[in-house]
């Protein structure tokens, strides 16, 4: 099973998770500490403290959003339902921002 080394707060990690989901790929998430000095497990597994990093079943490692997405997009065919998933995710994200967290609301003095 693929292993994604990532953090929840990282926008690049989020985009990689989204793409893996669109492609219907199961993967294991490895949470990485915020501080680079605390990333010994990541360094041991992939040789760097950069996130996101994706480790494939065959031992191949891709580091960084651009490298991971390029590898996924060139190696795998997108399933028919990927676009529908993308649209639903974007709609849910907008709804959350508008209704739940009120992030898009202007600050009131």
Where do the protein language model's features map onto the residues?
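GST-like domain detector, emphasizing the conserved glutathione-binding G-site
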Residues: 1-8, 12-109
């Amino acid at each position: 099973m693929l292993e994604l080394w990532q953090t929840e707060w990282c926008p690049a990690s989020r985009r990689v998770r989204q793409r893996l989901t669109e492609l219907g790929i199961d993967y294991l998430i490895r949470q990485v500490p915020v501080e680079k000095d605390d990333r010994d497990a990541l360094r041991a597994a992939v040789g760097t403290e950069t996130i996101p990093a994706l480790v494939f079943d065959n031992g191949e490692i891709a580091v960084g959003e651009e490298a991971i997405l390029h590898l996924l997009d060139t190696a795998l065919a997108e399933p028919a339902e990927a676009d529908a998933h993308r649209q639903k995710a974007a709609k849910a994200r907008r709804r959350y921002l508008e209704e739940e967290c009120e992030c898009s609301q202007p600050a009131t003095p």
